[in-house]
């Protein structure tokens, strides 16, 4: 029998529902249960693909090409189970599907309403394809009281009535703020949040209380009394130094036991969290450290690069070192010399992105890394900027650029539908909307067996996730390779470049894909493990 755990949030946003859900899933996995995770996003966008990274954070891409919420990255990293398009849905996508059905006449002339049509669509999504799982954890985005979230709360309320008795559990994540002048944790915001939740028909079974100190017994009793839960169901979610300590913290607090008890399941043997303890110990007690610059355009919101920062942490864990990140806005390098910012650092990473803003700064960062022989990892846009830098500085093409920024005499980077045929720019197909030419999801690549990147992977065949609409122009391959920029990886048909590297440089690699999306704390991605290793070697030269 499949059991459902619905995770909601209250009091304030950004409490970490995604991490809480992923951590609970990890502990249940450690007990031997099969767990699936899903995310319901109340916003009206069809998906986050065209949303600003500075508002929404990163777009997490799945193997099947879905552009999803960054929380799915937490799910994958904590459980090791690849997510898919079937694990994330938005209000926008639900309305899009319902309106399409209405236009086709599928509803036979019925009046389309939020209840039952929208709520039924949400329930169908939650219940689909779960027969092989013991637990399905469903996170509802936003905060209780948000008007756009009401259809989702109504849908999970209905599921609580429609599913067999004892197969649903509602976990409510709230904040217990500490007021220094009063010298105590305040429970009133949580009481009001639960009151709001109960007003729409949902009685939480477990309170997961985010706090910076242990909850005194008096406050526990008060929360249990006024929120109508057992005292044992008031679980403290203490702040911890690393997100990889959260499963250990929840296990200590008894969250997994309370969930199992709610479903009438035996606790059985204690879960084996040995690997989580190893990870937490390595994060707490590194044997060294390196400093790596991230030269990006969305550095104002670190969540815009969430998978990237976690992948670097994984690389550090594998070497037992702490990775210190120096965030640098790429536009700064368009006005100032990069040297004062980059001197003394052990590696430079230029991540993915779109648009001309900051592009020249990223090109200057790539040049600095090449000339100073500092380890460089260029991801997606970062690879393209490294190719433009090589074309300008080494191959005698001072006007080399990307057609993303406008017409250019040397389009070394172009739209996937634009390629140079002779001296003419050929357009294979008319450009559509912003998503029309995007290359999304997992694609295979073959690596040059003599290349550094093939040695890093230990394989000549790889599969990685992509998210881009511009590509390095293969018409320039011969000229660039003559100057030492090896096209070390290509698509299986040989038509699209996937990786480049500077021959003779200690560690300078560009990849068109996003390796950070497949890195796990227990299985660091080879590129990030190699990059951090190269940074360690460079640190010994400083």
From Swiss-Prot:
Top class in the EC scheme: ligase
Example GO BP: 'de novo' CTP biosynthetic process
Pfam family of the protein (one): GATase
Pathway: Pyrimidine metabolism; CTP biosynthesis via de novo pathway; CTP from UDP: step 2/2
Gene3D superfamilies, per the entry: 3.40.50.880, P-loop containing nucleotide triphosphate hydrolases
Top-rank lineage group of the source organism: Bacteria
GO cellular component: cytosol
Active site: 380, 514, 516
Sites where the protein binds L-glutamine: 353, 381-384, 404, 469
Binding residues annotated for UTP, in chain numbering: 13, 186-191, 222
Leftover remarks: CTPSs have evolved a hybrid strategy for distinguishing between UTP and CTP. The overlapping regions of the product feedback inhibitory and substrate sites recognize a common feature in both compounds, the triphosphate moiety. To differentiate isosteric substrate and product pyrimidine rings, an additional pocket far from the expected kinase/ligase catalytic site, specifically recognizes the cytosine and ribose portions of the product inhibitor.
Descriptive protein name: CTP synthase
Origin species: Methylobacterium radiotolerans (strain ATCC 27329 / DSM 1819 / JCM 2831 / NBRC 15690 / NCIMB 10815 / 0-1)
Name of the gene this protein is made from: pyrG
């Amino acid at each position: 029998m499949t059991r459902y755990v619905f995770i909601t949030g209250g009091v304030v946003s950004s409490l970490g529902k995604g991490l809480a859900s992923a951590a609970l899933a990890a502990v249940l996995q450690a007990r031997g249960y099969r767990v699936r995770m899903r995310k319901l996003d109340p916003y009206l966008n069809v998906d986050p693909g065209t949303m600003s990274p500075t508002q929404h954070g990163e777009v997490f891409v799945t193997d099947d090409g879905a552009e999803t919420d960054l929380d799915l990255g937490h799910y994958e990293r904590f459980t090791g189970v690849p997510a898919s398009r079937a694990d994330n849905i938005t209000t926008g996508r639900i309305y899009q599907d319902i309106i399409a059905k209405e236009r086709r006449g599928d509803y036979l002339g019925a009046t389309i309403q939020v209840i039952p049509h929208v709520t039924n669509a949400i329930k169908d999504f939650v219940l689909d394809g779960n027969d092989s799982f013991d637990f399905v954890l469903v996170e509802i985005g936003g905060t209780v009281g948000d008007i756009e979230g009401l259809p989702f709360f109504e849908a999970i309320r209905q599921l609580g009535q429609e599913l067999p008795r004892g197969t649903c559990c509602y976990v409510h994540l709230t904040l217990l703020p500490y007021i220094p002048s009063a010298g105590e944790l305040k429970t009133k915001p949580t009481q009001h949040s639960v009151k709001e939740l109960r007003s729409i028909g949902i009685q939480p079974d477990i309170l997961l209380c985010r706090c910076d100190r242990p909850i005194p017994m008096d406050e526990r009793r008060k929360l249990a009394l006024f929120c109508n839960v057992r005292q044992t169901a008031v679980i403290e979610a203490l702040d911890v130094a690393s997100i990889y300590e959260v499963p250990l913290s929840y296990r200590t607090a008894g969250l997994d036991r309370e969930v199992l008890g709610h479903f009438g399941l035996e606790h059985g043997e204690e879960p084996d969290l040995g690997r989580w303890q190893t990870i937490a110990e390595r994060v707490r007690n590194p044997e060294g450290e390196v400093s790596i610059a991230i030269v990006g355009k969305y550095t104002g919101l670190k969540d815009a690069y969430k998978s990237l920062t976690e992948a670097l942490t994984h690389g550090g864990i594998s070497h037992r070192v702490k990775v210190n990140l120096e965030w640098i806005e790429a536009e700064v390098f368009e006005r100032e010399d990069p040297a004062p910012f980059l001197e003394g650092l052990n590696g430079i990473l230029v991540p993915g992105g779109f648009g001309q803003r900051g592009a020249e700064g990223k090109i200057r960062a790539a040049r600095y890394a090449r000339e100073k022989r500092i380890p460089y990892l260029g991801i997606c846009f970062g690879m393209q900027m490294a190719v433009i830098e090589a074309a300008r500085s080494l191959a005698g093409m001072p006007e080399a650029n990307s057609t993303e920024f406008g017409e250019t005499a040397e389009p070394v980077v172009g739209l996937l539908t634009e390629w140079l045929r002779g001296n003419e720019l050929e357009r294979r197909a008319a450009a559509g909307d912003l998503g029309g030419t995007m290359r999304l999801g997992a694609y295979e690549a073959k690596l040059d067996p003599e290349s550094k990147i093939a040695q890093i992977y230990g394989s000549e065949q790889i599969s990685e996730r992509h998210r881009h609409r511009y590509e390095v122009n293969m018409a320039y391959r011969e000229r660039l390779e003559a100057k030492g920029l090896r096209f070390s990886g290509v698509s299986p048909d040989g038509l699209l470049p996937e990786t480049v590297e500077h021959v003779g440089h200690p560690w300078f690699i560009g990849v068109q894909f996003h390796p950070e999306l497949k890195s796990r704390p227990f299985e660091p991605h080879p590129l990030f493990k190699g990059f951090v290793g190269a940074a360690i070697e460079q640190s010994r030269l400083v």
